[in-house]
């Protein structure tokens, strides 16, 4: 057997396999969030990003970079290492809720989120932004100023703005933890399905991005 001929015959196939593997490896969706995505008081594999990853095995690898209690500034401080480690193609930003709950100035949160989006773009990844809303008892003026951050940034960066999934969860008291803030384990499959529907048109493969 002429091994040189065999090697030459298989080389294009091996190259194609390598490029396919590299492309697949690059198709990662990173979730940069707080306790709403981290799976507060539950195992990590029960949280909605893990369920979405199970559902999306052929579409994208979902990496949950969320940490309970994170403010937008804390998310920003972790972002460069996450981008370097996972080299995601898309990054969903679900941050700001803890800023609002702690009474941070909306302008401060806006600027931090702006820096997050700039950092993602600089890493050649596609940022996706989630609308965040606060409980009504934080006052109309503060709530309006806070909520306005997200559509403003989405327009500024020309990026998708996803609805706040918790607005659906709040309608089902049986899906809420005792603190009235966090979704419980029973809510996670619904959130995963809800997010899958809204992310599917955004997290897709095309030849222009290959």
Question: Which residue ranges define each predicted feature?
Answer:
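A detector of low-complexity, intrinsically disordered, Ser/Thr/Gly/Pro/Ala-rich segments
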Residues: 2-4, 17-18, 26, 89
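Bacterial N-terminal signal peptides
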Residues: 10-20
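Alpha-helical cap/lid subdomain in secreted, periplasmic
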Residues: 3-5, 76-210
């Amino acid at each position: 057997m002429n091994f040189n001929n065999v090697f030459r015959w298989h080389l294009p196939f091996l190259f194609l396999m390598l490029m396919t593997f590299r492309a697949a490896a690059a198709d990662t969706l990173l979730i940069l969030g707080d306790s709403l995505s981290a799976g507060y008081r539950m195992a990590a594999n029960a949280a909605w990003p893990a369920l979405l990853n199970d559902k999306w095995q052929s579409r994208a690898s979902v990496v949950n970079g969320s940490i309970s209690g994170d403010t937008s500034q804390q998310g920003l401080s972790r972002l460069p290492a996450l981008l370097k480690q996972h080299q995601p193609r898309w990054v969903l930003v679900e941050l700001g809720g803890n800023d609002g709950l702690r009474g941070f100035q909306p302008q401060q949160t806006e600027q931090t989120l702006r820096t997050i989006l700039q950092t993602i773009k600089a890493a050649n990844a596609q940022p996706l932004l989630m609308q965040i809303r606060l409980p009504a008892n934080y006052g109309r003026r503060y709530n309006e100023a806070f909520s306005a951050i997200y559509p403003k940034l989405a327009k500024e960066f020309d990026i998708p703005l996803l609805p706040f999934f918790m607005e659906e969860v709040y309608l089902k008291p049986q899906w809420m933890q005792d603190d009235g803030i966090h979704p419980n384990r029973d809510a996670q499959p619904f959130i995963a399905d809800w997010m899958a529907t809204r992310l599917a048109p955004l997290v897709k493969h095309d030849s222009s991005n290959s």
